[in-house]
Each structure stands twice: as C-alpha cells, then as structure tokens.
Amino acid sequence: MRIDSTTRHVRGVALFERRIGEGPPTVVLHGGPGAHHDYLLPGFDSLAPGRTLIFYDQRGGGRSPVPREVPVGWREQVEDLEALRSLWGLEQLTIAGYSWGGLLGLLYATEHPDRVARLALVSHAPVWREARAEFEARFAERNLASGLQEERKRLRGSGLRETDPEAYRRRVFELSVAAYFCDP
C-alpha cells in the first residue's frame, strides 16, 4: 500500500499531511482540536484499498504546531481545509470526520456546501450545548469507572517519561482518549 507524507503550506501555517492508498481521495479529519491523526491509523487505514486516504494534522495539533499568537478557532480550521482542497486541485471533497473532525466536517459543509460530495460522521462531537453537557458527564463517569485513574497513576510512577519521552507522550494521549472507546 502506498504511503506518502509531506508538509503543506496554506494560509501562513505548515500542515503535516499523510496519504495512504491509491484511488479517489477521502479526507479523514481527526478529533481534537489540538490532537493528531496518528491514533486513527489503526482503524481508518483499513478503508484505504481502492481509495486514497488523506490525513492531515490540523492547525495547532500534532505535527502542525503554531505559535500562541496564531488563531486556531473553528473558522481558521474550516478555511485551512478549503485552502487544502484548492491546493489539492479537487472540486469537491469526500470527508470522513471523527469526533471534533466530524463537527469540523459539518462546519465545512455549512460554509462550503458546494465543495462537499460526501460527508461521513464517525462519533462526531456534539453540535448543541445540552448534548455537549450530557456527553461530558458521561465521559467523566467512564473516566472514573473504567480504571483509567489507576493506569494513569502507574504511568506517572513508571519512569517512562525519563527513559522514553516519546513513548510516554503517546501513552498519555492514549489514556486521555481511552474513555471515548470504553466498552459499556
């Protein structure tokens, strides 16, 4: 399977991009904001046969860091995606958005409806306040009930931060999103 990585310069920021597969493109939008696309690879790369999956680390996340003074709101994220679409030479996008990426896909479709061919939402972030409050309460409950606190405590005492900072960072991130994938 073909895998390519590059950095795209759009709207004054450098965005890391990874492409997997060959065929018609599907843009995969990761959660966050402020996260990276890597955690989606084990699940989403199985969709690559017959298409090109385009992942990119959104402004301010992963391998696309920005200085503090650079805005990273939803409008900037939407316009970054529009600038990438133009740079890629695509008339319309097929988008698969996970969590915050699903909400970003919805916002993009609202702002640029003529530029979206297909939009798949995977466990997208809540759109209205009441749903967000309910989600946050359930998420906090899963965080406590699933033994994640004990796992975090073990990690803090493991010495991994000093011996392998990158592995420590990855594990901290895994534990920060683990309650999203809790088995009810």
Regions found by a protein language model. Give the residues of each.
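Short, glycine/charged-enriched secondary-structure capping and boundary segments
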Residues: 41-44, 68-71, 109-110, 133-137
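Conserved hydrolase catalytic core segment
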Residues: 91-135
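Catalytic nucleophile-loop/oxyanion-hole region of alpha/beta-hydrolase
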Residues: 65-78, 125
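Flexible "cap/lid" loop of the alpha/beta hydrolase fold
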Residues: 118-161
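Conserved acidic catalytic loop of the alpha/beta-hydrolase fold
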Residues: 75-93
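Conserved HGGG/HGGXW glycine-rich cap/lid loop of the alpha/beta-hydrolase fold
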Residues: 7-70, 84-86
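Alpha/beta-hydrolase
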Residues: 146, 150-184
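Short, hydrophobic/aromatic-rich segments at coil-to-beta transitions
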Residues: 1-6
